[in-house]
Amino acid sequence: MTHVDAISAPAALGRVSVVLPAYDVAPFIEDAVASIRGQDWPDVELIAVDDGSRDGTGDMLEALSARWTGAGRAMRVIRQANAGAGAARNAGIAAATGAWIALYDADDICHPGLVRAQVAALEADPALDLAFALYRYVDEDGIVRGAQAAPATARLGTFDLMCDNLVHAPLMRARALRAAGPLDENLRAHIDLDLFVRITERRPRSVGVVPCMLSDYRRRDGQITADWRRMRENWGRVLAKLEAGGFAPPPARRRLMRARLHLYWATLAYQAGDHAAARRLARTALRADPGAILGDGHGRVRLMACAATLLPASLHDALRRRFNARRAA
């Protein structure tokens, strides 16, 4: 019996509303919707918000909605002028009727049992308001490029999320989500992080981890997360809001946060081909907290990847291909 097989949550727990913002995802939307419809939860409401797509995504959603039939299945399509991910999610949340609300992405794939496992995690621990499962990283062709390792603790709080926001495809108690307030539509990145830390500021360490791979997180060119400068700027805006509310980690923890964030930005810069920035950011991370970087296996790998950009291009490319092949194995 797998971990997912062992998870159960009674059907009487009610409707799960899945909010799915969509913008120019025509190549992926049908598979994403099918993976949600195929969940074994008995009452799933899908609210798809087309955010002014130009590639026919909205029309595809309308056609998929006409085929979304059967007991315990409801689908609504909202179409709006392009206003950004935050506005699209807010529109979907406002329309949701379920006791549980999931925020999924329109180019990702939900594995069987995802919804049930997330609801079960929240039902098993009343102190949790949000649950997410581990996930695989896939490219535009669906080829697996890596997997998210489990964090050191099964319950995460504000500091953990500000160091490394691992949350993807979360499911939340509707009342907790609405109490935390709408997503900040002025942010251009880390929109979800801003919401998550508002949830954990209301109830500390209220984010739970389901320790099995239950979704595919698609990495594509042009995604917001590919722009390390935008990510850094908006992370700073989230931090400023937290600090205005009294968030003040002690110096040692602040150094740890600085190290992890700079290494994350270094990784984004490396993936974008900005190798000079990757090396500079990695050096800052190492200076901030050498023990945190060198004492962590993933940290060492990221650091070595940035350092390898100093090698001749042919050797660096060969090492990168070998590393990617090992991650996908």
What do the predicted segments below correspond to?
Residues 18, 94, 133, 147-236:
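Conserved nucleotide-sugar donor-binding catalytic segment
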Residues 27-30, 55-65, 109, 113:
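Acidic helix N-cap motif at the loop->helix transition within catalytic regions
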Residues 113-145:
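Conserved donor NDP-sugar-binding/catalytic core segment of glycosyltransferases
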Residues 101:
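Short aromatic/hydrophobic "clamp" motif used to bind/position activated sugar donors
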Residues 35, 42, 50-60, 105:
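A conserved acidic beta->alpha catalytic loop
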Residues 80-96, 117:
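Glycine-rich, basic loop-to-helix element that forms the pyrophosphate-binding segment
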Residues 1-37:
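N-proximal low-complexity "stem/linker" segments adjacent to membrane-targeting elements
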Residues 3-6, 201, 213, 219-329:
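C-terminal subregions of glycosyltransferases and related glycan-biosynthesis enzymes
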